[in-house]
Amino acid sequence: MTKVGIIICGRYSSCGGGKCLRAVREHKGGFSVYPPGEEIQVVGYSQCGGCPGGNVEYVPEEMIKNGAQAIHLATGLVVGYPPCPRIRSFKEFIEKHYKIPVVVGTHPIPMKYYADHKNMSFWGKSMEQIAPALFSESPETMTEYN
């Protein structure tokens, strides 16, 4: 079993996490990095605290106390508009300070967002490099997450 924490964007602080939890169950999106059949348990779910992400300094510690072995930065940070400009900083800080792996992405990118974002100059390759698991999903899976 792998225990994970999820940090979402502060803009979506009222999000119920339905797509993220579905992706955990289905091993899709960012959770496809874990072996099929391996149980994934969410031991923490919080938001970044809003720009500039003050909770990122403290929230991982609580998740680790609950047994988190990895932290996921939610897909909303990748596909929100504008995408979070601090994703790389959050990932680097958490990995270096807390010595825990960070996966960028939770649920697959919904096709309706991908269709818009893929043509924007600020997105494309830079997001594929930081969140590769999100870009490996089929168009059918992405459409299922609309």
Q: In which residue ranges do the predicted regions lie?
A:
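Short beta-alpha junction loops
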Residues: 75-79, 106-111
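Alpha-helix-loop-beta-strand connector modules within alpha/beta enzyme cores
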Residues: 94-101
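Conserved mixed alpha/beta catalytic, RNA-binding, or beta-rich assembly cores of soluble enzyme
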Residues: 1-63, 83-86, 100, 108, ...
